[in-house]
Amino acid sequence: MPSSRIPALCLGAWLLLLLLPRFARAEGAVPIPVTCFTRGLDIRKEKADVLCPGGCSLEEFSVFGNIVYASVSSICGAAVHRGVIGTSGGPVRVYSLPGRENYSSVDANGIQSQMLSRWSASFAVTKGKSSTQEATGRAVSTAHPPSGKRLKKTPEKKTGNKDCKADIAFLIDGSFNIGQRRFNLQKNFVGKVALMLGIGTEGPHVGLVQASEHPKIEFYLKNFTSAKDVLFAIKEVGFRGGNSNTGKALKHTAQKFFTADTGVRKGIPKVVVVFIDGWPSDDIEEAGIVAREFGVNVFIVSVAKPIPEELGMVQDVAFVDKAVCRNNGFFSYHMPNWFGTTKYVKPLVQKLCTHEQMMCSKTCYNSVNIAFLIDGSSSVGDSNFRLMLEFVSNIAKTFEISDIGAKIAAVQFTYDQRTEFSFTDYNTKENVLAVLANIRYMSGGTATGDAIAFTVRNVFGPIRDSPNKNFLVIVTDGQSYDDVRGPAAAAHDAGITIFSVGVAWAPLDDLRDMASKPKESHAFFTREFTGLEPIVSDVIRGICRDFLESQQ
C-alpha cells in the first residue's frame, strides 16, 4: 500500500470513532454476556451490546489492529486494548465494519496487539450501555438470560488431533511463475490440508509464509488454533508476485519462524512444507542445510516438473533431494498440476502426522527410552539411596520427556524387583522427577542378573516397537549373588545399550560384563556415593554419542 494512504486511513478511523457515539443511542437492550474467546466475526449484527467478563487481557485472547480491529480478534480483548473496559470487564458496544489492509501492532493497556496484512471484515468498540448486570472475574452464565430465551453458547477452543502433534509452516509459492489463478488453487489445497490435520490447542499448529521476491510471514503458529480461523487467514492472503526465491524463503522460515515468541512448542516436531511450482529461481541446497541445523523437517511438494526442453533453465535438477530433511522418499511429494488435487490431501496429511519419521527433529534428548535399574540392597543404606536417586534425577531431567519425546522408567532391585514406574506411566518431566524423589528404599540382597532380565522383559518388552533408542543405566554398590553376563548379553542382543555405574564394593569385572562396548566408555566407578555427581555428565554424553552413531 502506498505510504500516502496510511495517514488517510488512520484519519478515517478516528473520524469513524468520533461519529460512533451518535449512532449509539439505541434501544435499551440488555447486553449479551460473552466470553473472552468471542470474536468480532461471531457477532452477526451491524451493532451489538455485549457484556465482557474479567480476565480478557491475557495473550491467548488474540487482538489484531488498533482502533479498528480485524474481526478475528477477541471482542473483549480489543475492548481492553482500546481502554473501553478494564481488566474486570464491563459492557461494550460493537460495530461491524468493512475489511481493510495493514492492521497495526500497538501495545496499549497491557495488551500487545498483532499485525495483520489484510482481513475481510473489521469491528470497532465503544463503551456499552450500563445495566443492572455487572461483569465479574468469570464469564457470565448464559443458561437463563433475562429474556427467558436460551442464548447460543460460544464454543470452547478445540483440543485438536492429539495424535498429530507438529508445528507446521506452509511455505507457498507467490511468484509470477505460478500466477494468480494457480496461486488461488494452491491456497485451496493448503486449506484442505489444514482442515484435515485437526488443528487445535493440543494438536497441530500451523502458520503460513509466502515465497516471492522477498519472503513474507503471513501468520505465525500462535495466531490461530482452530481450523476455521486458519482457513479464514489463508483465504485473505494476497498474491505478491516476483521471483520465487524459494531458497531465500526457506532459510528465512527456518531462522525466523520457529521461535518461542512466535508459538513454537518445546518437544514438538518442526515442519516446513515447501510448495514449488516448476523449479526454484535460486539455490535451495544451502537453505536445506540451514533448516536441518535448526532441527526443521523440510518437505518438498513439487508441482509440474520441468519438461526436458526446460531443464536448461533449472539451476540444479536435484534440488528436491538436496533440500528435504532426508533423501529417502518420505519427505518429497509430487503432484502433476493444481487441478483435481483433493486425492493428494490425505497422503500428505498422513506424512505430516507421522512424528516418528521426523528425522530432523530427532536428537538424543527427545528420542531415547532410558530405564534406570537402582540397587536397593541393605548395603546401600537409606541416606546413600537418596544420593543414588539424586544421581538418576540429574540424568533424567536433561531429557525432553513427553508423550512423543524421551521416555523414562525406573526399577528397584534387591533379591526381588519392583517396577517403580514404566515408560508409559508419566509423560512430563515434572511428574517423573516427583516420582523419583519419592521412591521408597526396599533393603535386601543383591541379584543384579535377575533384575536385568526382569527389566528387559517387563519394562522394555512392552515398548519393543518404539522408534526411540533404548538405554539401561544400572547403579549398584556391591557384588551380585547371581550371574550378570548372560542377562546383560541378552539385553545387548535386544538392542539395549547398557551403562553400568558402580559405587563402593561393586566389582569392576561385573561392571565391565554388564556394560556395552566399548567397555571403557560404558562402565564407571566411584569409591564414594558423593562421587556419583561428576558421572552424570559422562553418562549423558555417552547416551548422546551412542544415539548419534545409531543414526548414521
Swiss-Prot record:
Please describe the organ and tissue distribution of this protein's expression: Expressed in inner ear structures.
The record's subcellular location field reads: Secreted, Extracellular space
Keywords, comma-separated and alphabetical = Disulfide bond, Glycoprotein, Hearing, Repeat, Secreted, Signal
Q: Which residues form the LCCL domain?
A: 30-123
UniProt's post-translational modification comment states: N-glycosylated.
Q: Where is this region: Disordered?
A: 129-161
Q: Report whether Secreted shows up as a keyword of the record.
A: yes
- Origin superkingdom: Eukaryota
Where the record annotates domain VWFA, the positions are 167-352, 369-539
Q: Which Pfam family is one of those matched by this entry? A: LCCL
Q: What function does this protein fulfil?
A: Plays a role in the control of cell shape and motility in the trabecular meshwork.
Subunit-level organization = Monomer. May form homodimer. Interacts with type II collagen. Interacts with SLC44A2. Interacts with ANXA2.
Q: Which PANTHER family match?
A: COCHLIN, COLLAGEN ALPHA
Q: What is this protein called?
A: Cochlin
Q: Which organism is it from?
A: Mus musculus (Mouse)
> Lineage, please?
Eukaryota, Metazoa, Chordata, Craniata, Vertebrata
